[in-house]
Structure formats: C-alpha cells, structure tokens
Curated annotation (Swiss-Prot):
This is Charged multivesicular body protein 4. May be regulated by aurB/Aurora kinase B-dependent phosphorylation. Homopolymer; forms elongated striated filaments of uniform ~10nm width. Monomers interact in a staggered arrangement mediated by complementary charged electrostatic surfaces. Interacts with l(2)gd1 (via DM14 domains 1 and 3); the interaction is direct and blocks access to the surface involved in homopolymerization. This interaction may be required for the ESCRT-III complex role in multivesicular body formation. The lineage of its organism: Eukaryota, Metazoa, Ecdysozoa, Arthropoda, Hexapoda. The gene is shrb. One of its GO terms (biological process) is dendrite morphogenesis. Expressed at considerably higher levels in testis than in ovary. Expressed in midgut, eye, mouthparts and male accessory gland. Disruption phenotype: Lethal late in embryogenesis. Dendritic arborization neurons have dramatically reduced dendritic field sizes but increased dendritic branching. Increased ectopic axonal branching. Conditional RNAi-mediated knockdown in germline stem-cells (GSCs) of the germarium delays or prevents abscission during GSC division resulting in multi-cell cysts that share a cytoplasm and undergo synchronous cell division. Conditional RNAi-mediated knockdown in germline stem cells (GSCs) of the germarium produces egg chambers with 32 germline cells instead of 16. Residues 22-88 form a coiled coil. Transmembrane segments: none annotated. Residues 169-226 are annotated as: Disordered.
Length: 226
C-alpha cells in the first residue's frame, strides 16, 4: 500500500494466515543463510589478499583488511537477524500447532455436546434402574422355571427309598432262584484195557442180566461195551 493510501484510509491489506506467515519467514531465512555463505566466502577472499600483500604491498593489504572488517560486521548483523527470524518462525509454528490442537478439541467437544443434547442424566439413571429391575425379574422367572417345586412336591423320600430297597431285594431273589443246581460228577471211564478174563466175566454177567431183564436199554449198553 502507498503512503497516501495509508494516510487517507485506503483499503486495508488482508492479514496473512499463520501458514502464510510461516512460509514467508522460511523464505527469508533461506535468503539470509545464502547471504551468510556469500559473506563468509568474501571474508575469506579478503583475508587471503591481505596475507599475500602483507610484506610487498601494505596498502593493498590494509584495504583488504578494512573490507574484511565491513563484511564481518554485515555478517554479524545477518546472524542476529537470522536468529530473530528463527525464533519468530518457531513461535508461529508452535502457535499454529496449538491452534490446530485447540480447534480439534473444540470440534470434539461440540460433537460430544450434540451427542448428549437429547440425553438427561436423571433419565439415564432411571433407565439403568429399569434394566436392573428387569434383569432381576428375568432371573426370578428362570429360577421358578428351573425349580421342580410343582412336580413331586407330595412325594416322600423315605417311601421312595423303601420301594427301591424292595425292588433290589426282588431282583436278588430272582437271581438266587435262577441259579441251576450243581450236577453230580460221574466217575470217568477207565482208559486202560481190562484183562481178558475180566472182560469175559463182565460180558457174561451183562448178557445174563440182559437176557433175564429183557431191557432194550441194557441191550444197547451191552452193544456199546462190545
């Protein structure tokens, strides 16, 4: 804006945003760093000229030293300016970060407020009490359903135990009755051959008994022995 514009109330310039200000400071900072490098190189050149002419041309050497002093003064000023710009940029970056954080927190708070605008703490407590009450009712109903009070309440445990003992005794008696009586063990037939005389005597005795009795079973037994 021109000087007359400022004096007579011309249009005001729009203030830059924080991001734009930070960008401008970074550009200025880079420019000053390049200026520093240039001055440092010039100072080194003037120092070399002074060294070369220290003995053979003192006038040139003195002029080089004077120029070096002026350059060093400029470099010192740039160092101070650069430090100020760096601090200002860091302060703006910190403020920008804080602004972003606060904006995010405010948005979150607004969203939370909108989420709770239709909620009332007393209503929430009442609702939780209702839920707890209904849970108690559901638990009581489950206990009532699972408890077989309505079935078999008139039964006597002693009568049931006595009836069970009678059934066990009955089963035991049936098992005892069903056991077969032991069969008498017959002597085993001799495996050795009988003497001839004993065989003849046995045969004659058996034949005589069969003829006298005329029993068909004895005849069959006799035929087996022969």
């Amino acid at each position: 804006m021109s000087f007359f514009g400022k004096m007579f109330g011309g249009k005001k310039e729009v203030a830059p945003t924080t991001g734009e200000a930070i960008q401008k400071l970074r550009e200025t900072e880079n420019m000053l760093i390049k200026k520093q490098e240039f001055l440092e190189a010039k100072i080194e050149d003037e120092l070399n000229i002074a060294r070369k002419n220290a003995s053979k041309n003192k006038r040139v050497a003195l002029q080089a030293l004077k120029k070096k002093k002026r350059l060093e003064k400029q470099l010192q000023q740039i160092d101070g300016t650069l430090s100020t710009i760096e601090m200002q940029r860091e302060a703006l970056e910190s403020a920008n970060t804080n602004t972003a954080v606060l904006t995010t927190m405010k948005n979150a708070a607004d969203a939370l407020k909108r989420a709770h605008q239709n909620m009332d703490v007393d209503k929430v407590h009442d609702m939780m009490d209702d839920i707890a009450e209904q849970q108690d009712v559901a638990r009581e109903i489950s206990d009532a359903i699972s408890n077989p009070v309505a079935f078999g309440a008139d039964l006597d445990d002693e009568d049931l135990e006595r009836e069970l003992d009678e059934l066990e005794q009955e089963n035991f008696d049936k098992e005892i009755i069903g056991i077969p009586e032991p069969t008498p063990t017959l002597p085993e037939a001799p495996t050795e051959d009988l003497p001839e005389k004993a065989k003849e005597k046995k045969k004659a005795t058996t034949t005589t008994a069969v003829e006298d009795d005329d029993d068909p079973d004895m005849k069959q037994l006799l035929s087996w022995s022969n």
